[in-house]
Amino acid sequence: MLVYRGHKGRLEMKVTARGRSAHAASNHLGDNAIYKLLPIIEAIKNMEPQLGDHEFLGHGKITVSDMHVKTPSINAVPDEATIFIDRRMTFGETKAAVLAQIEACIPVAVRDSVKLAELFYDDPSYTGYVFPVEKYFPAWAFPEDHPLVQAGQAARGVIGLAAAPASKWNFSTNGIYWAGKAGIPSIGFGPGDEVTAHTVNDSVSLADVVKATEFYAVLASQIPL
């Protein structure tokens, strides 16, 4: 278990294609929205080697993570299809540049019927009030010599863990807002192995849970006043 001092940013997007419905037996009368997305999906699949890289945070990532299709039935040509894109951004990559990368994947011939859009957190509160927040958060990292990072490293030593450089998450945490947008000093430390996160092998060692609680109990005493 290491002290983590940063991770990549994130931008969530969708690309929606619109076509024309028809019976599958007369598909030549329709305009299949799914087919319009195929070259875009292929371009995204092949994009990752060209994404940004950083010596600490690592290489940018991109994934087509979901697809929704509107169709009268499974015996019809779908008239609308949407893919959802998860983009993990390293240092040096900007929101504008990421959006431009996806726009460039849309073939000129279908740009009138295929549109890119950012995603927002816009679920209503219990009162019905909606406060949209963009699903974009920049990459962030605090230096190894930051007082909070150093306090975390000291706490690891107090609980008997061998010295090791502070590292970074490969996935995203709430630090994307606290540190990435609000600039609040943040570090991470916890049980579990992120390599198995969101897999059938996702698990946490109980011994690591106990050791993590020791760290949390000690951390505040290591922060300089």
What are these regions (language model features)?
Residues 4-225:
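Metal-dependent amide/peptide-bond hydrolase catalytic core
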